[in-house]
Swiss-Prot record:
Coiled coil ranges: none
HAMAP family: TMP_synthase
Similarity annotation: Belongs to the thiamine-phosphate synthase family.
Name of the molecule in the record: Thiamine-phosphate synthase
UniProt keyword Zinc, yes or no: no
Binding site for Mg(2+): 79, 98
Species: Lactococcus lactis subsp. lactis (strain IL1403) (Streptococcus lactis)
Swiss-Prot/TrEMBL catalytic activity: 2-[(2R,5Z)-2-carboxy-4-methylthiazol-5(2H)-ylidene]ethyl phosphate + 4-amino-2-methyl-5-(diphosphooxymethyl)pyrimidine + 2 H(+) = thiamine phosphate + CO2 + diphosphate; 2-(2-carboxy-4-methylthiazol-5-yl)ethyl phosphate + 4-amino-2-methyl-5-(diphosphooxymethyl)pyrimidine + 2 H(+) = thiamine phosphate + CO2 + diphosphate; 4-methyl-5-(2-phosphooxyethyl)-thiazole + 4-amino-2-methyl-5-(diphosphooxymethyl)pyrimidine + H(+) = thiamine phosphate + diphosphate
UniProt-annotated binding residues for 2-[(2R,5Z)-2-carboxy-4-methylthiazol-5(2H)-ylidene]ethyl phosphate: 143-145, 174, 194-195
Top-level taxon of origin: Bacteria
Cofactor binding note: Binds 1 Mg(2+) ion per subunit.
Cofactors, names only: Mg(2+)
Keywords noted in UniProt: Magnesium, Metal-binding, Thiamine biosynthesis, Transferase
């Protein structure tokens, strides 16, 4: 909610589909451990997850929201306005193909944060006046975490985009431990990651490395 400070530094995105070899319950346990490892934002993104019914999805989201709340981690819902409203989430994140930010504002009011994905200069320019609270720019590097990802923009182009940007921003897409250093020097408010954490052998150490580089 907007009465809290939105700390974007270590922005974790995941759903049960990001642990394909695990049951939904075991995936929730893994995600919960990562949420409690020091991340600052958790985005519930469950595209590709097969649930028994709508109620099971709601229960999964509620369980993860409760973990985030207890850990003082901001809880963001990906795309789904209805779910964000039902949970009274801290915010919602949408893409260019979803409803406009102004339309979403009509549905959720002013209390939730709205994040918007941006992948090129034209979208960035439009986003400045969209009413979004923060942006996710990328993909920066090639990524396997999203099958519908746009072409990578690269660090140099991202740096130029940030020169024309007035909104808090996370970089996203293909971020590895080795790329954190170069991303620390271009003015990002945070990095949004999936596999960097889901595939990590030590979640707390990886989150600490993110925070050491993105300040």
């Amino acid at each position: 909610m907007k009465n809290k400070i939105l700390d974007l530094r270590a922005y974790f995105i995941a759903g049960p589909q990001d642990f394909p070899k695990l049951s939904i319950d075991d995936a929730i346990d893994k995600i919960s451990v990562i949420i409690k490892s020091g991340v600052t934002v958790y985005q519930f993104r469950d595209k590709g997850t097969i649930y028994k019914n709508k109620n099971q999805r709601l229960e999964v989201a509620k369980r993860l929201q409760e973990v985030a709340q207890k850990a003082a981690v901001s809880f963001i819902v990906n795309d789904d306005v209805e779910l964000a409203r039902e949970l009274s989430a801290d915010g919602i994140h949408v893409g260019q193909d979803d409803d406009s930010v102004s339309k979403i504002r009509e549905l959720i009011g002013q209390e939730m944060w709205v994040g918007l994905s941006v992948s090129n200069d034209m979208e960035l320019e439009s986003a400045q006046k969209s009413g979004a609270d923060y942006l996710g720019i990328g993909p920066i590097y090639p990524t396997n975490s999203k099958s519908d990802a746009a072409e990578p923009i690269g660090v140099d182009h991202l740096r130029k985009m940030l020169e024309h940007n007035q909104l808090p921003t996370v970089g996203i897409g293909g971020i590895t431990e080795n790329s954190l250093t170069e991303l620390s020097k271009i003015g990002l408010g945070g990095v949004a990651v999936i596999s960097l954490l889901t595939e990590s052998e030590n979640y707390k150490n990886m989150v600490q490395k993110i925070k050491q580089n993105i300040r």
